[in-house]
Amino acid sequence: MIDIILTTNSPGEVASWVKPVVEKLNELNIEKNIYVFTPPCVFSSGNEGRVLSELNGITAAFNSRQYLKYILLNIKPDNFKPSKKGFILFLGGDFMHAVFLGKKLDYPVYAYTERDYGFPKSVKKYYLSDKKLYNKMTKDGI
């Protein structure tokens, strides 16, 4: 069993990035849990959890309150049962939340980004859609 933990926040990211990623992951013939954390974000609508719960293949989705309790107080959400093997995939929000989860679970962190990058020493690999950003990151030694 492998855990695939996605971090995202706003409705746009849930619709544009999480949904197609989950659909592709569902095509893989592997035993997996797909967990989605929606850390605190000023752009959050509050409806992300409901939308995520309607997506086929997501094992569980956690709101910002559950995320904070887990990160700060080590109180796991009831339906979060991490295995020994997994990874974090950043799909939006603040990079630090994906990094915190990666450190807590000892999972590598991967990130998809269109505009910036953060915590380069803590992110194993970046996935980019923009050649200009790739050139900037390369110039910066990332």
Task: State the predicted function of each range.
Residues M1-P11:
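Nucleotide-activated donor-dependent transferases that construct or modify glycoconjugates
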Residues P11-I142:
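Active-site and donor-binding regions of nucleotide-sugar-utilizing enzymes
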